[in-house]
Design a protein with these regions (language model features):
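A generic structural signal for ordered secondary structure
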Residues: 30, 46-47, 73, 182-184
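Conserved coupling/switch loops of ABC nucleotide-binding domains, chiefly the family-specific signature
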Residues: 41, 75, 172
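ABC ATPase nucleotide-binding domains
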Residues: 1-61
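Residues located in well-ordered beta-strands
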Residues: 49, 61, 75-77, 119-123
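C-terminal boundary and immediately downstream tail of ABC-type ATPase nucleotide-binding domains
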Residues: 55-79, 104
């Protein structure tokens, strides 16, 4: 499949043709396309370059559609300008009023930090060469487990049952609990 994707991209570039490629495979969508259209039940959700859509999803459906491993989804709440995942206050969100939200955190949005604000149960560590995948859990997580990708040079205490993280704000997305539309919180 990877070789086929490479051949399709090579033919597109050589012939300079416009191709409409329909797929449910997000890896194909990300790797072959210059522009993608994400649809849900026949309704267009977002149009953009693969990187734009990944970095700037308009809603929770789009955020969950793109990315391998997938985005980690939590139930969260905004209280007095702070984002809480359970009892963990993880980020300042002064521009957002108090409410319940869905929180999406990309796997690369975690920073391993000994006393980081997000305390998780460590399930296992997977060495992937240049990266390490930390598989953990948290009571507020909607996924069966949290997948965080960190640099392999980071040191993970595998003897511990706990792992703590800080979060990269540009990899954290807030979504309305009812409509699942993204809530802007980082921009002025």
């Amino acid at each position: 499949r990877l070789q086929t994707r490479e051949e399709i991209k090579k033919i597109q570039q050589a012939t300079k043709i416009t191709t409409v490629f329909v797929t449910h495979d997000q890896d194909e969508a990300m790797s072959i396309s210059d522009m993608i259209v994400v649809m849900n039940k026949g309704v267009i959700q977002q149009i953009g370059s693969p990187q734009e859509v990944y970095d700037d999803p308009v809603n929770l459906f789009v955020a969950k559609f793109l990315g391998t491993p997938p985005i980690n989804v939590f139930r969260g709440s905004i209280k007095n300008g702070r984002l809480y995942l359970g009892s963990d206050a993880v980020l300042d969100t002064p521009k957002v009023h108090d409410q319940e939200v869905f929180v999406g955190i990309r796997p690369e949005g975690f920073i391993l930090q000994k006393d980081g604000p997000l305390a998780c149960t460590l399930n296992r560590v997977e060495v992937m060469g240049r990266d390490i995948s930390i598989v953990s859990s948290h009571p507020s997580c909607e996924n069966s487990s949290i997948r965080s990708i960190i640099n392999a040079e980071s040191i993970v205490d595998t003897a511990s049952s706990k792992v703590c993280f800080a979060l990269k704000p540009d990899k954290v997305f807030l979504f309305d609990k009812d409509s699942e539309a993204r809530i802007e919180w980082r921009r002025s």
